[in-house]
Amino acid sequence: MKRIAVLTSGGDAPGMNAAIRAVVRKAISEGMEVYGINRGYAGMVDGDIFPLGSKEVGDKISRGGTFLYSARYPEFAQLEGQLAGIEQLKKHGIEGVVVIGGDGSYHGAMRLTEHGFPAVGIPGTIDNDIAGTDYTIGFDTAVNTAVEAIDKLRDTSSSHGRTFVVEVMGRNAGDIALWAGIASGADQIIVPEEEFDIHKVVSTIKDDFENRGKNHHIIVLAEGVMSGEAFAQQLKEAGDESDLRVTNLGHILRGGSPTARDRVIASWMGAHAVELLKEGKGGLAVGIRNEELVESPILGSAEDGALFSLTDEGNIVVNNPHKARLDYAALNRSLAQ
């Protein structure tokens, strides 16, 4: 394989630029040419394809976002869109594609492989909701951004004796809420993987203020459960009388310079994706398990579902067996600040 392309698709994630950089530099070191595709699959169909060299990726490792831009392009799910994209790849002499993104991006990569264009996926999403890898690119940065924000909210919460509901991204997976909540010492964490009793949530708030000597309360809520405003309304209807505020961290979690960890794993996975394409392998997704590079079928990585579930005792059972087990209940209550 002499010429490959790289694209980013779906929601952006800190560390995508580091992955692109690794793809380009590794490919060049292997004597391959690299082309960039702007705006994901939309750019592929439109022919927005151009050569990439070492100069184009210089100083990109520390930048957030993706300099190749990104877009959601549902039309690529249809055969017509796929064939139009493949026509452009052929026109530019491209023999393989590295796709950086989430589950929707992975489905597009699988379609390319089925049409004879080997594609390798790199998990790039802050939600950490791709199976086959312990961590996705951008997750660590998003968690650190969330923790920094929650720490600051705790300052104002304790100054005024308030309850804060902090909404974070996580449509189908509560990983950001879980990890950021634990790291910030949140009093309660509400995730899609666990059903909650609103009356117990209210009771816990009341217990903190009346019996535990606390003058503030922090609840971290994954957006996949419901919006922060809707959750706050349920709290009030269930009898919460605390001075309640809602903060939605929203898209701020996608921005910022990637952490060292995100830069490193993005570099590892980008280089490994090139190695797979050099061997003519497609339909695979690169991942990190136990700090080692692995690959798995790309479609399975996109469709394995939730990465963890919670037992009645509050224990986190990670569906990916290579992830650590954490005691949700113990960390939530005994270590809460």
From Swiss-Prot:
This is ATP-dependent 6-phosphofructokinase. Mg(2+) binds at D103. Belongs to the phosphofructokinase type A (PFKA) family. ATP-dependent PFK group I subfamily. Prokaryotic clade 'B1' sub-subfamily. It catalyses: beta-D-fructose 6-phosphate + ATP = beta-D-fructose 1,6-bisphosphate + ADP + H(+). Pathway: Carbohydrate degradation; glycolysis; D-glyceraldehyde 3-phosphate and glycerone phosphate from D-glucose: step 3/4. It comes from the Bacteria. One of its GO terms (biological process) is fructose 6-phosphate metabolic process. The keyword Transmembrane helix does not apply. Catalyzes the phosphorylation of D-fructose 6-phosphate to fructose 1,6-bisphosphate by ATP, the first committing step of glycolysis. Disulfide bonds: none annotated.
